[in-house]
């Protein structure tokens, strides 16, 4: 059981004070009957709530797979730039957040949820969760780079980057690679290649914690996960 004003607030219908005004003005119905008491307790799993005639379903947890496009930031809100949450147009809850972050100019798989426990498990350094990236690199990548990445590249932090699995997809003036890392340091992939004298020109995350980006999703598109 939960208060009707809390229910509507969690579903992103406004602040608690705004919602109390909506309820008292008779714009909220529960099971087809108008309610005017914000403190009214309802069963969020069985009762139907509507605001201005529109049904507001309840979701305790939400999970989305987003194909983050370049130019969008991995944040919940920002005064200047569009955020990944701005792209989730049919979300129910107002407490969603991205699990980790991708750089502004990086695209690819990003999980969006309000499940803090899951996020902690996936982001904990102790878990060594695989993150797989596809990249285009300016410059030739060869087997010596594969070995260097496996040994751990010193990118200027207190400790070198952990062993990473570099797979060469195409080698030439512009190379294409797939890289699996288990850390999430600041600009890590770009810094690792920079140490080897190469520049990343395109970067996309294709897998995270065993979840692969749905190839049907274009940049900016998303789908719910169950």
Whereabouts are the PLM-identified features?
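Basic, flexible Lys/Arg- and Gly-enriched helix-loop patches that mediate nucleic-acid binding at interfaces
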Residues: 2-225
């Amino acid at each position: 059981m939960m208060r009707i004003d809390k229910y509507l607030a969690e579903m992103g219908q406004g602040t608690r004070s705004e919602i109390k005004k909506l309820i008292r003005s008779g714009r909220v119905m529960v099971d087809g009957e108008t309610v005017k008491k914000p403190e009214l307790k309802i069963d969020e799993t069985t009762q139907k709530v509507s605001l201005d005639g529109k049904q507001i379903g309840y979701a305790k947890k939400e999970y989305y797979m987003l194909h983050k496009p370049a130019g969008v930031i991995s944040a919940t809100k920002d005064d200047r730039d569009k955020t990944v949450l701005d792209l989730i147009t049919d979300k129910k809850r107002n407490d969603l957040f991205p699990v980790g972050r991708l750089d502004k100019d990086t695209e690819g798989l990003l999980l969006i949820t309000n499940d803090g426990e899951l996020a902690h498990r996936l982001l904990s350094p102790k878990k060594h969760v695989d993150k797989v990236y596809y990249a285009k690199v300016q410059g030739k990548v060869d087997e010596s780079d594969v070995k260097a990445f496996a040994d751990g590249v010193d990118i200027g932090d207190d400790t070198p980057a952990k062993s990473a699995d570099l797979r060469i997809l195409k080698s030439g003036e512009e190379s294409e690679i797939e890289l699996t890392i288990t850390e999430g340091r600041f600009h890590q992939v770009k810094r690792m290649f920079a140490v080897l004298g190469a520049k990343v020109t395109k970067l996309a995350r294709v897998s995270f914690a065993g979840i692969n980006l749905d190839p049907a999703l274009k940049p900016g598109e998303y789908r719910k996960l169950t």
